[in-house]
Amino acid sequence: MVFGQQLRNLDEKNRIALPPAFKNKLVEPLYLTIGFDGQADLRSEKEFEKFSAFLDQKNPFDAKIRQIKRQINSNTFEITLDKQGRITIPARIMQWIFAGEELGKEIYFVGAKDYVEIWSKSKFEALNEKVTPVGLEKLVEQAYNEK
């Protein structure tokens, strides 16, 4: 399981060192895809297969499901670590992570239990600024009271 967060810097070739705490939890090959909140998601092959199987269980006649699968599958890349323990983030994923802002070099790796989220620094910090103890409490109440 992967927890915590770390800020790292991309080099000029969009390579970034995977934090050791995360690298030790993920087994290659790795799959990098777009996430649902403007981040990218990095999964082990096992976790990516589980994620894909979940999507495959949905109604194939539903246009929204087909569009989700199309976007996920067309924006997924198999990633390997180089000898220095770095991954290269493809240009399309960089555009997704930095959508609506200038391409930057600071990236947050965020543990999401079964996978790692990759965020632009500004988006992740803006997201965290919105969460207060009271706001989180209300969000939890709403989520657990939904049917």
Curated annotation (Swiss-Prot):
InterPro entries: MraZ (IPR003444), MraZ_C (IPR035644), MraZ_dom (IPR020603), MraZ_N (IPR035642), MraZ_sf (IPR038619), SpoVT-AbrB_dom (IPR007159), SpoVT-AbrB_sf (IPR037914). One of its GO terms (cellular component) is nucleoid. Residues 5-47, 76-123 form the SpoVT-AbrB domain. One of its GO terms (biological process) is negative regulation of DNA-templated transcription initiation. Keywords: Cytoplasm, DNA-binding, Repeat, Transcription, Transcription regulation. It is found in: Cytoplasm, Nucleoid. It comes from the Bacteria. GO terms for molecular function: DNA-binding transcription factor activity; transcription cis-regulatory region binding. Pfam families: MraZ (PF02381). Belongs to the MraZ family. HAMAP family: MraZ (MF_01008). Forms oligomers. This is Transcriptional regulator MraZ. It comes from Mycoplasmopsis synoviae (strain 53) (Mycoplasma synoviae).
